[in-house]
């Protein structure tokens, strides 16, 4: 949530956009700067992420933050929002990029080909992170994995070849991709872990 908050705050400071967040609970209160920000809380302002997302679309946002993709309805609503031109940020509890893609796809029993096509079309990037203990045991440091949605990745998703994402990720350094293993090695070289 700290990483997403930093992304939203960067947009808020640099761009004149309408940002709507859906959170459970609201963890960080934003003050509108260049952007106009509206924050909605599940349980207080809306019954669920899925219902809140459908309502948010009527508010004409440019950017939507979804606190968590918990269920099929929320995932479907987030994909629809992205398809209609909204920049959607969301969290999903998985261990890696391949797991994130598979979790989204596995949420749907029927219409999986449609979901693969939707996801392949709208996905921009996946950033996975885990917190590792720092050397000396004081504090933690984030270890990242970054998967960028290139045409080749979109094809893997569309064709149902998600088992090849991990090996594809290792070849994507030129496009800005990073595996957790590569980043962990960098953290060790810096003496952080």
Give the location of each predicted region.
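Short, flexible helix-loop junctions that flank or precede catalytic/ligand sites
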Residues: 1-193
